[in-house]
Amino acid sequence: GATYAELCRNFKWEIPQYYNIGVDVCDKWADDKTRLALIYVDSDEIEQRYTFRVLRDRSNQLANGLNANAIKRGDRVGILLSQRPETLISHIAIYKLGAIAVQLLTLFGPDAIEFRLQDSAARAVVTDKENLSKIFEIQKRLPHLNLIIVVEAGQQEGVLDFWNCVEKGSCAFTPVKTKPDDAAVIIYTSGTTGQPKGTLHGHRLLPGILPGFEFYHNLFPREGDLMWTPLDWAYIGGSYDALFPTLYHGYPVLAYRPRKFDPEKAFYMMAKYRVKNLMIVPTALRMMMHAVRRPRERYDLHLRSITAGGETLGEALSDWTREQLGVEINEQYGQTECDLVVGFCSEIMNTVPGAIGKAVPGHIVEIIDKDGRVVKGGDLGEIAIKSPDPVMFLEYWQNPQATKDKFTGEWLRTGDYGRKDENGHFWFGGRQDDIIESGGFRIGPGEVEACLMKHRAVALVGVIGVPDPVRGEIVKAFILPKAGVTPDKALEESIKEHVKKRLEAHAYPREVTFVSE
């Protein structure tokens, strides 16, 4: 039962001289031929189970297949697949080959895919027949792309069938000896301006992410742990915040991702497969809260840990999770370039409503000013992480200027505003580029949203700044009222008053728009 202070004090990074993600999430567990790695449930609820042994053999076969098609160390390979076994097998094979995986979201349209495959100069892409038409549409503009591997390709011209490619390969493959700083994966991140940037991570990303993962999941692993996330594995939140750290520890993951998130189905699946660990975004959890107020009366749930990130939780959601799911939700904070660095571990510390947590042991996180000096005394500044840090990205792919701009001295700037209180808790103030400057005041939309979520009539909220001739900008709130609440002038006044009282007089929304969905 170590305390937070002890965990921080005793923490030491120990990353070996040679390190490969593919070996560490798969091969090291494959000697036990019965050890379960993945339960895959497709949209028709047909289930397949994969052991670590089978994943090792299939990924070795695919690595040989890629090799036979001239894919070598350092080549970029796009993965345009959702949560399914072939996605995982592709990742592991690419890493063992010393190539670089490029994570692509199946929700992307052709333009978004084209930019990413063009920018990364990907030599190959692995996809399914559903997304193949997008690749065909852009293929002639992608001179580097000379290999298309398709799950269930059928008799399609000009492509390789995934499982044919696997079956032709030998189960024997010697993984390339990679170092922790050797490139492993590119994850594109959208900026507020211009095109997305390719965040290039080394193999050290996985060891770098483990302290945060173990922290948020209440000292993972425990006997019987089983992970599920409704997030697509093409997001860092799906792959590196859930899938890979679980497999690193030799525990199983449920792969299930229907086209449309269905809150009742989510409860059903978690009960059926005895999910212990959940990684989710607050919006999805809110949908679950609104759909099933008392889930434990309807479902036999076994949850041990829930972590959420990507947006502010709000007190109502935390309270409901505690009361109705019997689990204290652990907020997590990070970004694609430097993930899982702040959060809570309810096992060893009290969660604080509204705060995003403390620095995860192993990471040095502070609030800095524009010159890179640490800000004291709870003042507003930018959340920053001190380098070097294993979880930190190597660079933006072929964009040295953007990489340079991300740092001030030894500090990686997140672009997020926040405060750090005297107890070491961080409070999120909003994105730097979302900050609303109104009448000389700097207002973080995140804080206003969190405050509005505490209003008895509010189900969902979004806050932006809109131009104003007098104040420069004013706060505007879009509000989805709770079921049965009729939006009227009185409610609008009550909402404004609530923020004036609960947050700050100048931060209230001067414009309120009620929405129906």
Language-model segments: which ranges?
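Gly/Ser/Thr-rich phosphate-binding loop
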Residues: 248-251, 275-280, 289-351, 364
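Conserved pre-ATP/AMP-binding loop-to-beta segment of ANL
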Residues: 34-36, 150-156, 167-188, 195, ...
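Structural core segment of the AMP-binding/adenylate-forming
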Residues: 68, 89-92, 96-164, 178, ...
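Conserved structural elements of the adenylate-forming
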Residues: 59-61, 167, 199-220, 285-289
